[in-house]
Amino acid sequence: MRHSAAPIRAAAAALLLAGCAESPPPVTAERVLAVGGIQPVVNAVALSPDGSVVAVGDMDGELVTRELPSGTERWRGRVAAGRVDGLVFSPDGSLLASTAQDGRTFELWQVLVGRQAAVLEIRDSRTAAFHPTEPTLVVGSLGALHVVDAQRGEITRTLPNAHGGENVYAAAFSSDGQALVTASDQGNIKVWAWPTLTLRASVSMSKSLEQMAPVSLVIGRQGTRAAANGLLGRVHIVDLAKQQEERIFDNTPEAPGHGMHAEMRRSLAFSQDGDWLFAPAMHDRGVRILNLANGKAYPVFTGDAPFYKAMSISVPSSLVALLRPGDEQGRGPYALEVWRLTYSTR
């Protein structure tokens, strides 16, 4: 069942993003869409860069895209892999990549018409990252990195054993496309020069169960700072230039069904200037913004869900899409929510 949600005004901060480092930015959020009554176990959500489409994937392998802000269903499709674990749009919004960590294939879909553009034999794909300007993407599969020509739907290069026997769990390009950053299942981050894929830097995050499953990874505009959140939800900030961990922001589960954060892929996003980071709120009840200079966290909004199980943040379109369970145990029926961010001005 689809319905338009009554706007929910969120908690706001006090000063401009460019203002005093001791003060939070004036970000407010309003819920602009809610789609409830979803029966399959939804597992992944993604926003197109321009904010015109939201895609949802579930554990049964079904893809559903909706137009924004209306929420009108555009198309449904079913992936060959049998499940959807991650979704990512191409920079121009024309393609949608679907990963399946226990599947035998990786897929590209044409967003406009809902047709498969390519089905590639890439097993256990954990992550995919589109190049910002080239028709190319990188797929992490077990320990390898596969370079894929998005136009032809072909693998053009494979870098085996990219992390020295560790599996690749996350990947992201810098905004200028000159660097690729990857994270392994053991919490090791590597920075690769593009397109040569020569190693530029390597950093290890603090060793614990937390780092053994990084689920979201982003790199700042200057390419000198990266952020990752892991299985327990903590956010790790890494100084790539100094090749060391900079700071950690905590997160904890709250509801009984909220023990792990394995579905929080693509739940981090740097601000345009790279000085702030959007991230899941404490207990995954909404969104907060982190001041990377002083280590403080400020609320952006808190929803009424017991917790959110997946999230996608699009800074260019000022939108956040979230998936929520029906109860504190993480069971259905599930729902999709979309919130719009607003920045105040002086």
Language-model features, listed with the residues they occupy:
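Bacterial N-terminal signal peptides that target proteins for export
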Residues: M1-A11
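Bacterial N-terminal signal peptides
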Residues: R9-G19
